[in-house]
Amino acid sequence: MGKPTGFMEYDRCEAASVEPKERIKNFNEFHVFLSKENQQKQAARCMDCGVPFCQSGMTIAGMTSGCPLHNLVPEWNDLVYTGNWEQAYNRLHKTNNFPEFTSRVCPALCEKACTCGHWGSPVSVRDNEHGVIETAYANGYAAPKPPKVRTGKKVAIIGSGPSGLAAADQLNQRGHDVTVYEREDRVGGLLMYGIPNMKLDKSIIDRKVNIMKEEGIHFVIGCDVGKDIKPAELYKKYDRIILCCGAKNPRDIKADGRDAKGIYFAVDYLTQNTKSLLNSNLTDGKFVSAKGKNVVIIGGGDTGNDCVGTAIRQGAKSVTQLEMMPCPPTERAANNPWPQWPKVLKTDYGQEEAIAVFGHDPRIYKTTVKEFHKDKNGNLKELTIVSLESKKDEKTGRFMMVPVEGSEKKLPAELVLIAAGFLGTESYVAKAFGVELNARTNVSTQEGHYATNVKNVYVAGDNHRGQSLVVWAIREGREAAREVDESLMGYSYLSVQ
């Protein structure tokens, strides 16, 4: 612990952002990260606690507290404070293959469990993580390091999202010959097309993927396994296969008029916009435009927020975000104590931009769509929305959100984006490999393991645990890699945490 009194001497300081009305003019990353001096002050605030919940990744009250990757936060904070940036990078990279991603898109579970934040403000862990990895790139610490010995074993990974990339990175370090198959035209999966460029600049992904290529990992893009290439062909070429295909089956909305023109799933909307941005700087017209339209987003999560920010940048006339659940409290409730994940109101970048542009928060709580209304040409023109309330189901004993009779209202809308979450993996991949699915339509395995019912076929990421965070996908990829390595070699020294 470099400075025992640091948490008393320095206040919390975190990355700033470009002003909302300025940043909506483009799709560039808008965070202004801390200087090294401020990063070192934040590192000095780290208390090196007796029980550092920041790195615990424990499940408390059904939710994760601390980092699922068990990042050695107190250790590398101390190294940052003392100016030993290379060693800080080594400690960070020991548990996290992709800090350049998590330092930009992770909700910072570590900070919510920080002891310093129990009575005061937490350490700016995510900003320091960003500082460590960017310093590593600037000084050559994050250079390619190909394995010195190859095992002769071959592994195919289906999907290049965070779990697939993590598994590939780990297995390649072990010396196995790894090939990653990606159906899209670029590597990255969710990172590339599911997260907008202003949140994660795609050059950051390309930078890391290029290093992985130099380290010997092979990438096959534009190949949809299960359609373009059959599993039987992969079985002949590879000793093991890991399915990292994500949970891309979107949850739909059942309401009259659902077939109206102008209703899209959020993931398709975001994907098309990013593709057009990267291919032509949005000049090819191959995207759904919100320009001049009243936009309604169904869903209050991160994807819904990304849609808010994207629609505003496209020039939407208005943006409304519907959330089924009640508005969370601004502070922790008595039954939600630290170090549990705080169930409190969060105003994200998209909502901040809506407030700046339209003068009000775009969210309407305890509300859903009752009916979509079309014009004579079948185009969406407005919605009927209805308020919801929590009621106990007498049969099950569970509380459910149900419509409030007589609360219907009309809302103008020419574009609706459904961001209601995902139901599980796409069925054609599972059918092609013959893997079993569980009740949640995720690929089934024994608890705590990654082997499927099909010999030599493993699974990791969202198509295993369900829709989740990037940090969880990385952890799944690392754990699956270790299990695959052990099955190939009889033992494994790949670290998981």
Predicted features, each with a name:
Residues 40-56, 62-147, 213, 221, ...:
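Glycine/serine-rich phosphate-binding loop and adjoining beta1-alpha1 elements at the start
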Residues 12-34, 42-45, 365, 373, ...:
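C-terminal catalytic lobe of FAD-dependent flavoproteins
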